[in-house]
Amino acid sequence: MPNPSQQKLPDLASTRKLQGLLAVGHLANDWSPAAIWLLAPAIGLAFDLQPSQIGLLITLHSFGAALAYLPAGILSDRMQRPGKLLLFTFWWVGLGYFLASFAQNFWVLATVLAMAGMGDAAWHPIATGALARRFPTRKGLALGIHAVGGTLAEVFSPLVVGILLSVMEWRSALQLSILPPLIMGVVFYKFRNAIPISTTSSISKVDLVRLLRSWTTPKGLALITAITTYNMALIALMTISPLFVQRELGYSTSEAGLFFALAMLIGATGQPLVGRWSDRIGRRRVFICGLAIAGACALLATGFPQQGWTAGVLIAAMAILVFVRSSVLAMAVDFSRQREATTLGFIFALMDGVGALGGVTAGLVGNFEL
């Protein structure tokens, strides 16, 4: 007699309900990590940190996440039912960031935030791997819809935190930010066995060697360079822009939150459209076009830093880089053509590991300019 969870599976996996469930889960899981973008300047004030130390805090936060991506992807490809792993990530995130709110110095806080970020990181290759398997011909669109959830977290979480920081200190604001993942951790329990199973055999050492060889070819190395450079630029902008608009343009914390939220909201709405566009005309064309336009916007902002439209240009630069994120992930899966979760785990590790150096680099520049 079939398992009840198996009877539910086709109905969930064959409709948009799967995309909706994973997008909402993505939003909840990313809520606490996204709060750090606006909490970081407040933490800097509380701990009397330099801009470079604020950048280092965000870099270590991202680096901790990078350590979890690849193991999570490999584990997902070894397990037929990834839903239980996804359920576990909500509780890891909630409890991890709650503990971080009690840190009394920079290094304890950085360490606990890095460990908490691992829980959120584990969600990404597992969920996106399931979507890439379920929608093989529409990866750009499917990953774009999933990405909307995470980007909406980066819209509303900093916005809410910016408001909270005007009435409370950063520890209380961080503690309130754990509510979405904990609530979703309860809701998701019902769906833990309804995530599409993997029909391929468990990943082996031979598979890993084959995957590694494909990424060490000249084409693979060029793609790695492009992806890490892209994420360094995005993280650098996301790190320094809230600090810049507060120190140079005189924004309050709530105004900085609104500025950041607007950039992420514009980026979120564009991801499914740009992902679908890349399904039709090709990933590379979309990627190159997006980077060129975003780079031009960033140069305009640095060339005229005191102009009234500077914030608008920075919003455009961040939004455009967010636009192409789903296309970047789909481009990586198209290249490897195997083991979607492991491939995406590898790419996420590159983006948040090597790419996170953009945060500390931006902070070092801020030491001299802000």
Description of each model-found segment:
Residues 338-368:
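A late C-terminal transmembrane helix in Major Facilitator Superfamily
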Residues 112-150:
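Cytoplasmic helix-loop-helix junction between adjacent transmembrane helices
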Residues 2-13, 195-224:
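Juxtamembrane intracellular "pre-TM" segments in multi-pass secondary transporters
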Residues 178-200:
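C-terminal membrane-cytosol helix-exit motif in multi-pass small-molecule transporters
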Residues 281-331:
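C-terminal transmembrane helical hairpin of 12-TM major facilitator-type secondary transporters
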Residues 36-37, 219-268:
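Extracytoplasmic gate region of multi-pass secondary transporters
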Residues 67-104, 278-284:
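Conserved MFS/SLC helix-loop-helix module at the cytosolic interface between two early adjacent transmembrane helices
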Residues 59-74, 261-273:
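Central cavity-lining transmembrane alpha-helices of secondary-active solute carriers
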